């Protein structure tokens, strides 16, 4: 299989560095992390630029420009390279031959949906826990962004050679599921014909529990209508959590998301996993019995200094040690969470948690726990996802009374579609808050990134029929040497895709794929639009069949790259639009 230009250049650079090591200019065994090969901001500086000389010079104590000159001299001898220059403190700027860019189109045509794929993950197992919404109701837009970010990140890591486990942690052991069970009990009594008026204060008010109450009434009749809570709480809790998880799975399916594993908090506790984690940590003197400092500020008269099992999280950078049990001996949420990460780490080389930004205050303690539980041998990342503000034509969306004062994810998908939702969730960094405006996300405007990227793909798809109408057949591989400068500029943008994929995977930032696609689509549209004023610039121009075949080959390659990027985002490409 043909190799992408990005992979070839990296291989060339590695060989050149190897030659310098053999020559004694660079010591063997140096850590090459931090070496980059990127497109410079100014095209006048070349097609590619590498910081290799500066990184290696810092490690070896040599002068970066001297090392850059040696690198440049060897890189200049490579077949794909037209010119090499040293700039600034030691950047090596590379200009590639037109033939190299033309060949990249053939690589895209050969690799198809594998173009951009990378082996950098080397088969490492990554556990990504995402969504993990409390099983107390259907999913809403507050859950949506983390779901899409987590799933797109999983796609990205799988595409770059990682083995990925998509995991959902079910918080089914806390007080909120008891409240859920009591809420379902009230709906159960309503289903039996009782008139209870408004939902009691503190219970979940959404109508989504009515079907659960009806199912319970059908199964149990009036057996638990007036029974003491101890008789029915556990039963109603299990039944209602199961019903809510089924709803959540259905909501996720609407987004095109399915998890490989569901882990239950209640099952962890029942299996004694927190006890196992505590014992393991005590053996290493990372849990001790101690008394916490009194709360800062005015201390409640009810506060008492009580000895509790404390995890030494300050040893790992936290601002205080954390209790893993409550005064009554039951587990704190952190205590169970600690055990959960202990279990996850058993069959994964890396752990990633996708959390809502409202959990920012607990990140440090979990990072500390993960470092302790893996003895610092496994990478652990927490990615925080900021809120999504729902608007309609610039005005805040009123909440849904039926859903319990929130807008359900299912309602949003029904209105605008899965692909619009998924794409929009990736148009900003996860750490930045975003607006989702029902009016603008479906606009046929270049200011709408969803439309602009999909429109580029639809235009490319339309070329097949336009070419046929003009009597243009692709036939044998075209003469790509007929592609001019503007066309090769578009090739250069598309050829960045493998590097962008690797960089996005390394940074754990799937939004970079959306950014790349927006840029690629913009350059494609710009080239397309030149044909409006000058018919000779059109992709399908029957008066010059050889050039048209080359341009159509280019367009097909661009369409392939767009599809590959959309696939990583979990978005289906649009093949036809009225404006195409």
Region spans (language model):
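Non-catalytic interaction-recognition regions
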Residues: 1-104, 110-580
């Amino acid at each position: 299989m043909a190799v992408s230009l990005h992979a070839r250049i990296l291989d060339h650079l590695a060989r050149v560095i190897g030659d310098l090591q053999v020559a004694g200019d660079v010591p063997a065994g140096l850590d090459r992390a931090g070496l980059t090969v990127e497109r410079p901001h100014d095209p006048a500086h070349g097609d590619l630029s590498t910081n290799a000389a500066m990184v290696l010079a810092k490690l070896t104590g040599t002068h970066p420009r001297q090392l850059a000159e040696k690198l440049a001299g060897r890189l200049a001898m490579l077949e794909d390279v037209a010119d090499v220059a040293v700039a600034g403190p030691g950047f090596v700027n590379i200009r590639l031959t037109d033939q190299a860019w033309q060949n990249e189109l053939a690589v895209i045509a050969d690799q198809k949906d594998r173009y951009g794929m990378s082996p950098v993950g080397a088969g490492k197992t990554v556990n990504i826990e995402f969504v993990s919404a409390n099983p107390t109701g259907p999913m809403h837009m507050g859950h949506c962004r983390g779901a899409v970010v987590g799933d797109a990140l999983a796609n990205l890591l799988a595409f770059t050679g990682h083995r990925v486990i998509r995991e959902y942690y079910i918080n089914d052991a806390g007080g909120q599921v008891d409240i859920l069970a009591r809420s379902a009990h009230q709906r159960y009594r309503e289903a039996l014909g009782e008139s209870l008026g408004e939902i009691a204060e503190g219970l979940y008010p959404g109508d989504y529990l009515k079907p659960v109450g009806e199912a319970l009434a059908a199964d149990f009749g009036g057996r638990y209508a007036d029974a003491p809570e101890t008789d029915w709480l556990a039963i109603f809790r299990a039944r209602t959590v199961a019903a809510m998880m089924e709803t959540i799975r259905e909501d996720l399916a609407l987004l095109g998301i399915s998890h490989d594993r569901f882990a239950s908090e209640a099952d962890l506790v029942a299996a004694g996993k927190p006890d196992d984690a505590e014992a393991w940590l005590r053996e290493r003197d990372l849990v001790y019995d101690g008394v916490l400092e009194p709360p800062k500020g005015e201390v409640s008269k009810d506060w008492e200094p009580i000895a509790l099992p404390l995890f030494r999280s300050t040893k790992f950078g936290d601002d205080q040690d954390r209790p893993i049990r409550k005064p009554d001996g039951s587990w704190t949420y952190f205590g169970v969470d600690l055990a959960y990460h202990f279990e996850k780490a058993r069959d994964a080389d890396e752990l990633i948690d996708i959390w809502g930004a409202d959990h920012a205050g607990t990140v440090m303690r979990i990072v500390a726990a993960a470092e302790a539980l893996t003895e610092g041998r496994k990478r652990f990342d927490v990615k925080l996802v900021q809120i999504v503000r729902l608007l309609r034509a610039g005005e805040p969306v009123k909440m849904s009374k039926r859903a319990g004062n929130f807008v359900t994810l299912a309602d949003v998908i029904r209105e605008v579609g899965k692909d619009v939702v998924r794409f929009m969730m990736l148009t900003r960094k996860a750490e930045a808050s975003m607006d989702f405006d029902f009016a603008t996300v479906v606009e046929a405007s270049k200011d709408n990134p969803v439309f602009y990227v999909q429109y580029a793909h639809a235009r490319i798809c339309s070329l097949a029929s336009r070419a046929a109408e003009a009597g243009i057949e692709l036939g044998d591989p075209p003469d790509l040497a007929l592609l001019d400068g503007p066309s090769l500029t578009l090739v250069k943008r598309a050829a960045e895709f493998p590097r962008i994929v690797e960089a996005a995977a390394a940074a754990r930032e799937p939004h970079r794929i959306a950014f790349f696609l927006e840029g690629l689509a913009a350059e494609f549209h710009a080239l397309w639009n030149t044909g409006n004023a000058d018919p000779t610039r059109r992709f399908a121009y029957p008066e010059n069949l050889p050039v048209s075949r080359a341009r159509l080959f280019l367009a097909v390659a661009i369409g392939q790259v767009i599809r590959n990027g959309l696939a990583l985002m979990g978005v289906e490409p649009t093949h036809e639009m009225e404006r195409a």
